[in-house]
Amino acid sequence: MTNQSLHVNIDKWIAENETSFLPPVCNKLMFFYQLNIMYVGGPNVRKDYHIEEGEELFYQVRGDMVLKVIENGKHKDVHIREGEMFLLPARIPHSPQRQANTVGLVIERRRLSKETDGLRYFVANSTEVLFERWFYCENLGTQLVPIIKEFMDSKENETGKPDPANPIKPAPYPLNTMNVMTPFSFREWVEKQKPVLASGCPVDMFGEQFETETLLFGSGTSANKRRTDGWIWQLEGLSNVFMNGKEYSLTAGDCLLIFGETEYKWQRSQDCVALYVAQDPDRKRPY
C-alpha cells in the first residue's frame, strides 16, 4: 500500500522533522491515512477556531500549550501541560495556542465524505461569529492557509464587525454541549493502571462514549483485524507485531501504524506497556 515505513522511533522522527513545523499551523504529519498522526510545534498563536465532526487526542511531548475552546457558549482556556493528555470531543470550536520550543502530539481521523469542517472567527471578547467558512477537509495544514488569508484581507477583519452583505449562514450541524475534560498526567495514569495490566486485561482510557479508542496493554498475545487504522505506541518493554509476512520489533519509544483490514498478531513481553489508539466513525455520537 505504501513505501513509507510504518515502524518509527518517535524521538528520532521529531528530531529529523522539527524544522518542518512551520506557521501558521506548524504541524508535520507522521502518518496520513485513515488515522492522521501529527506532531505540532510553535510558536503558533491563532485567532481562528476549528470545528470538526470527529475527535482530537492531544498529548504534550515538550512544553505547555493552551487550547482555547467554546464550551456551552463561553470562552474557556484548557491548559495542557508537558506530559498531559486530553481528548477533545467532536463539534467543539477550538483554537490551539503554542509557544516556541514546544512539541505536541495530535491524533485525528480522515473525514467521511459527508462530514464538514469549519473555520470560525469571533467578534472580539464575544462569541458572536465574525467570519466563517465550511469545507470538506482533506489536508488541514494546506487548506487553512487560504482561508486565513481570505479573512485577513476581509472587511470583517478590517472593521471587527460582521459584514451585512455576507450574512453568516446556519451551521451544518449543532455544536456539542458537553463540558470538556480536565487534562491529566499520562504517565501517572499509566502507573495507576499497572495492577490491572498485571491481570492480563487491557485498560480503556476514555470508555465507549467516545469514538476514540485508547487502550493500554500489558503482557500477552492478541490477534486482530480492525476496520480502521490502529496506532501502537510502545511505552515500556518490548513487543512484536506480525502482519503481511513481516515482523516488527518495538522497543520503548517506538510506534507502529497498522492499516485497517489488516490481520495482525501482537506478542507483548512480560514488562510491556503499550498504548493502542484507533478512531472509528461508526462510534460517533448522534447530534
Curated annotation (Swiss-Prot):
A single Gene Ontology CC annotation of this entry is: cytosol
| Alphabetical GO biological process terms | 'de novo' NAD biosynthetic process from L-tryptophan; anthranilate metabolic process; L-tryptophan catabolic process; NAD biosynthetic process; quinolinate biosynthetic process; quinolinate metabolic process
Q: What is this protein called?
A: 3-hydroxyanthranilate 3,4-dioxygenase
Per UniProt, subcellular location reads as: Cytoplasm, Cytosol
Known cofactor(s): Fe(2+)
Q: What is its EC number?
A: 1.13.11.6
Pfam families per UniProt? 3-HAO
Q: Which residues bind Fe cation?
A: 50, 56, 94
| Location of the region described as Linker in the Swiss-Prot/TrEMBL record | 164-180
Q: Quick one: which pathway?
A: Cofactor biosynthesis; NAD(+) biosynthesis; quinolinate from L-kynurenine: step 3/3
Q: Which residues bind O2?
A: 46
Q: Provide the assembly information.
A: Monomer.
Q: Which domain of life is it from?
A: Eukaryota
State the residue spans of region: Domain A (catalytic).
1-163
Question: What reaction(s) does this enzyme catalyze?
Answer: 3-hydroxyanthranilate + O2 = (2Z,4Z)-2-amino-3-carboxymuconate 6-semialdehyde
Region of interest (Domain B), ranges: 181-287
Give UniProt keywords alphabetically.
Cytoplasm, Dioxygenase, Iron, Metal-binding, Oxidoreductase, Pyridine nucleotide biosynthesis
Residues annotated to bind substrate: 56, 98, 108
In terms of Gene3D superfamilies, this protein maps to:
Jelly Rolls
Q: Keyword check for Transit peptide, yes or no.
A: no
